[in-house]
Every structure is written in structure tokens, then in C-alpha cells.
């Protein structure tokens, strides 16, 4: 009836067989085709770059992004699962530069832009097979046969349409600003790109003396972390409201903020004058490094709101060419800009000592030069966060350049309004990391002076007229001799000229391409080639109900999606977003090649399998928290959950196959067994709870609810009901056990199917398809199970849960005194009020005790030790510790311990101070007195009587003997139904135990005969420390 389970087969082998089944039967495509008439549920797949290898972080994103759509398909929704590839931008260009052995724009131009573009296009899918392989092994089901690709003409055309909308709304403009600039890549970067590349660096800073004009030995003391900007200084900024002083130090008079004198001035000093900052506004000084002197008036003290007293001297050197704040304040005061750095980040010729030198490398040389000239007060190393290029890792410069911008500052309020409509997981992202970024939003520098990207569709005429093109048809309509099959990339698009509608001359396209993040942020509409095609599909699937990516994307994709959607559609682009934490190594450290702690996801998939990897990420921690990931972690997950589920499934198949039991013949059978009713109630509660969690994106809670249920199914239901399956005749009680376990296994497989798609498919194919060839072909084509409120009995669940909890506490108490469960004990006391007798029998049987007393006062049997947790309580109330100890000692120790363990507040009053005692600031230990063992949790405590009489000792020996015999049957690979002969010898005392309990032994081990002291080979055993010889033999 059922396919026999191969115990030697690994989960990985099973998963490969399931993959073959899916591929041969087109199960993935059939899943995509489900629910054609259903309501749409949309999720967006943030596009990875296929010219980079996938890593463990991508395993996390894929298993989260796969789970929700699977669940929604089972719930009847039509889910579009379109894969995408992010193909433009610096990441691709840098890889090609490496491949070709060239570096920088000049060498690209020499190589040839057309050939360079071809190389970029050919490279973008370098690792696509690796991505597809990982996705298939993980069962990440997205349509990879028809993906959206950001370099395709259709996609670019939709992006052009979006840019035209911005143009029409006057949100796209050209400006000359000081913005972040990568000298290595030769292009400006946007604020969200900059936010992804900050690093803590330790660099030399300079305290510099600017000589006051017309004064001897009087200097204004300023501090800078970027000495290379000093040749371009035009002003010194102070805060007019701060207190400043003149300080005499080493025969020089230095001006600086009063509050910072002690931290800055070395040696002895004398304050000779105090004044407000406003008193020195306009004070002139001599140019510090006069390599280039501007014609305009400069070199004076001005007010700047950005000046603080947190570090430095309270006086800020200001170079408007290299700082946004500097640029704004200097423009306000009519000061000139001195730019002495070229676009490669090197000093120009007039800076004679360092001409042609990269500016960051010149810092130390400039400090040495100033020291020689006597204008350096001192230099110190300083650690600060400095932006680096997010792709090539070069330190960025703030640099004046022409660039195209999207006017995001005008949309700030709308961005915040749309952000507030999103359900963020975790919720603090809304007002924290993402919300703060939006509050401080600046205009988006969208243009890149590079090659491989979506060309900015703006044409300019020398008369000053500009035109933005929003489609290929518009390009052909307005362009001159546009090829029919026009390729929209550089250099082909640059050959297209437009006729100026103002003066009639030829218009040329501006040379820039756009930020590749604009490409990915356009995917909600561009993936459908909207508005040129699929208008209805886009309108039905926008905004998305769900997206999920790593926390870094709060500065990346989450932002660009929000920015573009707000600017064009005036709404939020997604409704629910799970923000994923970082994946760490087994020690909780960030993975890096330099540390040698990088885990290869393919190694883990090949050793432990996809289901285990998926389940680990669902249960190890909330998705937004950092997660440790290692082969050992995944293997532990496999053992704890998958193996438990598999063992229950194997148990059912083994016995159902022996009995040729077909549950389809008992569809209407209703079991009256209490355990069956309990597990069915728990099953229906599980469906309801998991559904509630999943509808609210509480993935970890949903997965842990399933894990807890499977644990109870295995370690409580099956454990308590094994004898029902072992009984020889197929009576009602056995039928009830089979019907119940079958129902539970098939239903829990449906519930777990979105989480662990492989093992659930295997179980479904054997238990459901194996019996009914008309059943749906795959579990992943099935609907989500419906719960039945009439089958949920909360009182029954509470009672059984309490019984199970008492059993677990009883086991814990036994362990605390090293008494095995096979050794019977006389009695157990339980603190809670009585449970129905049925549960008492279960507890006694499980714990191997003779008697149980409910509602007992345990205080006479337990020793309590309650004392302050000094590192916590001492820190807050150190001087009161002796009084606190005294107060604790005077209280009822058991009641105090119970309150603390149950999380109740306990307030004591010491010298008028109310002090709360809790589990954090108290150390509570409880143990049984001599002859007793104690364990407690929450409101339940248990005490075992550990005195063992001779009669109890004999029963314990019986249990040990039975265990040894059953293990020998397994080792000899006897079938469950095989009858045996039992031979014992070598210990008269233990032989008498066998004689006394022979009937029980024969029944439990299916022994036809027990033979004593026969001459033969035996297995030497230890029974509670006693030597004994046992042998078993199958009866042919």
C-alpha cells in the first residue's frame, strides 16, 4: 500500500528525488497557473546582479520571499512570481575593467565604448546558472524563464517614461552642486549610495594656525579631518552664540572656543580675553596656503550653524568646493569657490608641491609642509566615519560638478506620509532607520558620468533648449534618421540627434546614464513594460502586498521604490515589508573572506539540504535580527524538527503497512479516545494560529508553532499511543489511532508545505497520492487546510498541556538526582489543583510512579535559596544590599520564589525607596530536601519521593531488562511482528526478577519462550550495575 521508507536515504537524496518529480511533471509551472480567477497577491522580487556569486545572505532572502507567496497561493490568491536581474551600473563596469586589465574612463575610451558596452552586456549573466541552481535547490519558485531584465529595451523604455513623468512635473533638473564623487569611477553618487559605503577610518587630523591680518603672533586656531582641502580654504566658520577666547601659549596668541581650551591647548596657557563669537565676525586673516589666490574678497570669519563644540576648536576651516555645508554658507556670504582638484581626485598643476598626487595620499605631505612653515599647531590621529564608493571602495570626495537631480526635497512630506502607510517588520524601521532617512532626504543625484546604464533621455541644444524623450515612438517621431531597431544604450543612442523646436538646430543627448538604483526602483511598472503593455496587469498588481530584502536596502531598493512611486503615482509601492537582518557565522561574527569564516551556501545545501536551511532561518530568530548560520546549526535544526516529523511519518507507514490499513475506508470514522480528541483539537488550533501568524507576517511564531506541535505529536501523542498501534487485532481503538495519526500527518504536511516544501511533498506523495491516484498531483497544488471550530476543545488542550508539563517537570526532577525513568518511584506531589483521573493515570505511567497527590504544599520538601543578583541589584542599590538581603530572608521563601518565577512584581520599601524585585535582579534556586527531588516552572511545581524500596528496585530491574531485549531485537533487525526465544543466565538475583515478571516480559517482547541458564553464546549486559547475560533468537 505505502512505499517502504528507506532508512539509509538522507534528506538531501530525498530532496533530489522530489526535484526530479517537480521537473518531470512541471509542478512549478502548474503552481504558477493556479487561481487564475483569484484575487491578486503581489510580491516584488528585488533584482540581484547575476555577475556576482550568491552568498548565504541570499539564502535568507530567498527562503523568506518564497514562503509568503507559497502560503498565499494555498489560500487561493493569484500570485505573480516574476524573477528579475539588475544588470546595469558600476558593479558590471568594474568587473569588465578587471577582465580587460584597464582602469578608469580614459582607458575605457581608448578601448572603445561600443566594445566595452558589448563586454558589459555579455557579462551580466556570468553567474546566472549558479543563481538558478541555488534557487532550484532551495525551492525558491519564481519565473526565471521570463524574467525582467533591466538592460532590455522594453525595460529601458518604461524607465524613460518614468523620467518623462518627472520632467513634466518639473521634478527633474540640472544643477551645479558639491556632491559625493568617486574619483576612481569618475562619477557622482546619490545619497542612498553614499549611505551604504561608510567606514570607520583612522586618519591624521590637523590643528592649523591662520594668521590674523595685521597682527603679530595672533592666530585663529581651526581643526580639519581633511588636510587636502586646506589649499582651497576661503573662510573660517564660527558660531556667533558661542564663547571664544584669546589664549597666550608659547609666545603666541590663539583664538578658539572657550569650552575646548583644555582639550586642545598643550602646555601652560593664559586666557587673556573672552568674547562672543559675533564679536569676531568679519575678522580677516592671511591665506594659509597661497597656491592660487582668487580675485574675489575672501579669508574672513563667518557664522555657520553647523559649527559645534563636540570636537575640534569651535572654528571650522571652510572650503566651498569640497563640502555641502561649506558651499551653502559661502554662497550666502558671497565668497568664491577655489577648486584645485581634477576629476581624477588629483591636485592640479598650480598646487606645485603635490601636483598630480591623489588628494587623500597628500594629507601627510601637507601636514609635514605646514609643520615646516610653522603654521601647524599639532596633528593627531582621529577615528571617524568616512564615505567610500559602495562598489570600488575608494574614499569619496565632495566635489563640485554638474549633475541631474530629482527634486525629492519637494516630496519630503509625501514620502513620510506614504511611509506611514507601510507595515514594517520590525515596526521601528518606519520611524527609525527608514523614517529618519526620509526626514533628511536630499535631492537625488540621478546622473552618472559612466557608460553601461540606462541613458538619460534628455537632449540639449546650444540655444539652451532641452527636451526629455519618454518612449521609443517619441524618439522616432522627433529624432533624425532613427534606426527601426534602435539599441537604447550608449554609444548607439548618442548618435541620435533631434531637431530643436526652438531654433531648428541639431540637439545632442546629454552624455550621462542614470543611477542603476533608478532601474531597480522602477521594476513595479517596468517589469510589465508599462504603460506600453500590460496596463491592466500593472494596475491589478500595484502596489505590492509584500516585499522583503536585507536591512541595507533601507538606503537602497526600499528607498528608490518609495521615491519613484511617490513622485510618479503619489502612493506607497508596497504595503508590507520584512526587513532582514545580517547572516553571521557560528560565533556571531560578520562573515568575510579575510576572516576565513564565510560559509558556502552550496556546501550546506549539499550536506544538510534545503528544508533544514529554510527551517533554520524561519526559527533561529525573528527575520530582522542577526542570524547565526553554520553547517552545525543547520544539522541541529534538521535533527530537532525534520527528523522528528520524519520519524512520526515512518512510524505510521511501518505499522499501517503491516496492518494493510487504508484510511480512505474509514473517512467517516470518529474516534472517542481522549488523546485522539486532544491532538485533533491541537491540530485545528494550529491551523488557526499559523494562519493568524502568517496573515500578520509573523513567520517565526508560525514556524515555532508548527515545531512545537510536531514535538508534542512525537513525544506525547505517539509516545502515549504506541501500544494502540502494536495491538494485534484491528479494533475500534486501533482504527481511531490510525485514522487520527493519518489525518494529523497529512494536515500538518499541508500547514508546513510553504516552509519545508520537500519533506512535505514526499509525505504527501506516499500518504495521499499513494492511496488515491485521483488526488492532486502535488501538495503544492493543494489548498490551505480549513480549521473546524467544533473540534477545538480549549479546556481539553489546557488539561492535557498541564499533564504534559507535569511529566516534563517530573523528568527534570529525576534527572536532577540521576534516577532513570525506568526506575519506579512511590509518589509525586504536584502544586496545582487536581486534574481528572485520566490525566493522573497518564502522568503516573509516563513518570513510572505509583501515586500522585495534587494540590500539595511543597514547602516542606523544598529548600529555597534566594539572594540578590549583585551585578544587577548592586549597581542600582549598592548601599542598600545588606537591608535588601535581610528583607528577602524575612519573607515566605516559597511564595517569593513562585512570584518571581511567574514574573509577578514584588515591591519592598527600604528607607522610603520602593525597590522592585524580579527575575533579573534576584537569583532563585530551589532543590528538594534529602530523599526528594524538585522541579518547577511558572505556577507548577513537582516533588518526587526518591526513596527506593526493594520492591521498587525489582520493578526498575525489570524495566532495564525489557529495554535491553528490545534494543537487541533492533540490533538484529528483527521485524516488529517477529516472535522470539529469550535466553537469560549469569545472575541468580536477576533471573528471579525474570521469573517473577515472565508474563510481562513475554508479552512486551513477543517472546514465545524464556529459557534459563542454557549453554550457549550470550550478550553481556549491565542491569543497574549488575552483570547479566541475555540472548534473543527469532522463531522461524
Curated annotation (Swiss-Prot):
Keyword Disulfide bond carried by entry: no
Record InterPro entries: aa-tRNA-synth_I_CS, aa-tRNA-synth_Ia, Anticodon_Ile_ABEc, Ile-tRNA-ligase, Ile-tRNA-ligase_type2, M/V/L/I-tRNA-synth_anticd-bd, Rossmann-like_a/b/a_fold, tRNAsynth_Ia_anticodon-bd
Gene3D superfamilies: HUPs (3.40.50.620), Isoleucyl-tRNA Synthetase, Domain 1 (1.10.730.10)
Motif 'KMSKS' region location, chain numbering: 590-594
Catalytic EC class: ligase
Keyword Aminoacyl-tRNA synthetase listed: yes
GO MF annotation: an example: zinc ion binding
Residues reported to bind ATP: 593
Family annotation (Pfam families): Anticodon_1 (PF08264), DUF5915 (PF19302), tRNA-synt_1 (PF00133)
Cofactor(s) required for function per UniProt: Zn(2+)
GO biological process: isoleucyl-tRNA aminoacylation
Subcellular location: Cytoplasm
Chief subcellular location: cytoplasm
PROSITE patterns per the UniProt record, alphabetical: AA_TRNA_LIGASE_I
Reaction(s) the record says it catalyses: tRNA(Ile) + L-isoleucine + ATP = L-isoleucyl-tRNA(Ile) + AMP + diphosphate
EC id: 6.1.1.5
Motif stretch ('HIGH' region): 48-58
GO CC annotation, single: cytoplasm
Keywords for this protein: Aminoacyl-tRNA synthetase, ATP-binding, Cytoplasm, Ligase, Metal-binding, Nucleotide-binding, Protein biosynthesis, Zinc
Source organism, top-level taxon: Bacteria
Comment on protein domains: IleRS has two distinct active sites: one for aminoacylation and one for editing. The misactivated valine is translocated from the active site to the editing site, which sterically excludes the correctly activated isoleucine. The single editing site contains two valyl binding pockets, one specific for each substrate (Val-AMP or Val-tRNA(Ile)).
Function: Catalyzes the attachment of isoleucine to tRNA(Ile). As IleRS can inadvertently accommodate and process structurally similar amino acids such as valine, to avoid such errors it has two additional distinct tRNA(Ile)-dependent editing activities. One activity is designated as 'pretransfer' editing and involves the hydrolysis of activated Val-AMP. The other activity is designated 'posttransfer' editing and involves deacylation of mischarged Val-tRNA(Ile).
Family: Belongs to the class-I aminoacyl-tRNA synthetase family. IleS type 2 subfamily.
Subunit structure as annotated in this protein's UniProt entry: Monomer.
Protein name: Isoleucine--tRNA ligase
Species of origin: Clostridium tetani (strain Massachusetts / E88)
